[in-house]
Amino acid sequence: MVNLLAAYADRPEPRSVAVVGNQPLPSDPQRAKAIDACDLVIRVNGFVVDKPGEEVVGSRTHVVVFNRAIRATPYVFQDYRKRLYLLVEPGRMHWEPEDVPGWWPADLGAVPVSNREVVLPLSDALGLPTRDEPTWSTTGTLAAWIARTSFPTAQLVLTGFSFIDNPDQTSWEHAAGDSCIVGPEHQIAAEGRLLDSWTKTGDTTLLR
C-alpha cells in the first residue's frame, strides 16, 4: 500500500502527510494552509473541503479512506478518478455484508484495506479484541494509522479528531452538518489516547 499512496502524493517520499477528520472546526487560515501544504492529504468518509473564500480545512485531497456507511457530501466523489480510495472493512470479520451502495461510481476502483495487515495491528495497539469481538477503530484513526505506519519519518498533521479532547462523547457532529451516535463498535477513548501520544513524539502535530 505504501507504493500506492506514494504514487498519489506530490513526491515519491512524502515529507508531510495530513489526515483530516470530520469534526466541525472554526475558520483558521493557518490550519487550512498547513493542510494544503502537505505532500499527501488524506480525508475520511463524508468529508468536506473549503469552498472558494473559506479557510478551514483546505481544499486538496489525494486519498480518501472510507467505509460502506459513508454519507454522501458534494465532495466525496468529486474528481474521484484523480484520487486514491481506500475501503476499510473491519466489519467484514463479523457481520458486514460484501455489497457496496449502488450510488457509488461504477468505475470507482476502490482498494480494500487489509484487515490482517492494517486493522488488526491497530486493534492490538488499542487493546481491542477485534479478532473475537465486533469492536474496531473509527475510520479516522485507521486513516491516521495508515499514514503514520506508511511514512514513519514524515511530519504528520492531524486535525478534526474530536475524541482527542472529548473521549467520553456518545454522539458527534460532522463538518458536513449531520450528526450520529458514536458506534458501539468503537472505543474512542483508547483512540484518543493513542493519537495524543503521537503528538508527544515531535513528528506529529495536532491542529485544533
Regions found by a protein language model. Give the residues of each.
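Metal-ion/cofactor- or nucleotide/acyl-coenzyme-handling active-site neighborhoods
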Residues: 1-208
